[in-house]
Amino acid sequence: MTQTWQAEDGAEAALAVLRAMVTIANSTVERNTEQLTLTQFRALRVVVDRTPVTMGKVARELALNPSSVTRACDRLGTLALLEKAPNPLNRRETLLAPTGAGRQLVDRVDRDRRRVLAGVLRRLGPGARDAAIQAFERFAAAVEAEESDARSPLRRAT
């Protein structure tokens, strides 16, 4: 990748990394799930990570329209990657849980992503690799803090 950008705040460098990560995310989903769209896989990921979860929670987590999530989850159900059940506490809600095949699929994509990322990191020298890993850890923590602040009732009130 040719560096044609320079920005003091690092936003352009971060955007370049984001594009590379999205490419990895897309290619690993395509390679491991011929039948799923990226949105369907993202919905399955939320179900695996948050079981049991409602369709509404999946829609909020992915910032998608509930009808889009319903269609994605219907497809996942047809492929036997998730199961649906009525919520015993609220009959208007449907609870979602992954099947064994759904969990295995998410695990397979995760293994492929780890393999690809490890290959990219191996291309860096030891010092650059260690610095990149530390930067990833700090960046992930900063994103988590930013997301937490965004959900804060105090921030929404301002």
Feature map (PLM): residue ranges:
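Charged, amphipathic alpha-helical coiled-coil/dimerization segments
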Residues: 74-134
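Short, locally clustered residues in the helix-turn-helix/winged-helix DNA-binding domain
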Residues: 19-22, 45-49, 110, 137
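N-terminal helix-turn-helix DNA-binding core of bacterial DNA-binding proteins
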Residues: 23-68, 73, 79, 95
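N-terminal leader segment of winged-helix/HTH proteins
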Residues: 1-35, 158
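C-terminal regulatory/oligomerization modules of transcriptional regulators
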Residues: 1-5, 130-158
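Amphipathic, non-membrane alpha-helical segments in soluble helical-bundle scaffolds
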Residues: 4-15, 66, 103-106, 129
